[in-house]
Amino acid sequence: MGSGYAKKKKEAKLMERQFMEMEASLEQKRFSGEAGNGLVSVTINGKCDLVDVRIKPDCLDPEDPEVVADLFRAAFKAAKAALDSEMSAMQMGMPF
């Protein structure tokens, strides 16, 4: 096993450490999304765990309860897009 193998192994260890640091950093961050001009807001962490949900009473319509579900889905999608954007930006600095 020549020095090429040792170099590749060292690079792999470095990438693994960078990836673990990126994961740890993301876990500490919060990403928010909202829908309906702020009627529903959702916050997730870097692992995509739901951290907070806020629903303003104005969107609670007993005649159309599906509105809240639609707004929740849209707010979650926006928060997930923010997380995905952050992950993409972080991965740009990774050597793979």
Curated annotation (Swiss-Prot):
One term under GO cellular component: cytosol
InterPro entries named among the record's database cross-references: YbaB-like_sf (IPR036894), YbaB/EbfC (IPR004401)
tRNA processing among keywords: no
Compartments (UniProt record): Cytoplasm, Nucleoid
Family: Belongs to the YbaB/EbfC family.
Subunit note: Homodimer.
Protein's name according to its UniProt entry: Nucleoid-associated protein CT_335
Organism field: Chlamydia trachomatis serovar D (strain ATCC VR-885 / DSM 19411 / UW-3/Cx)
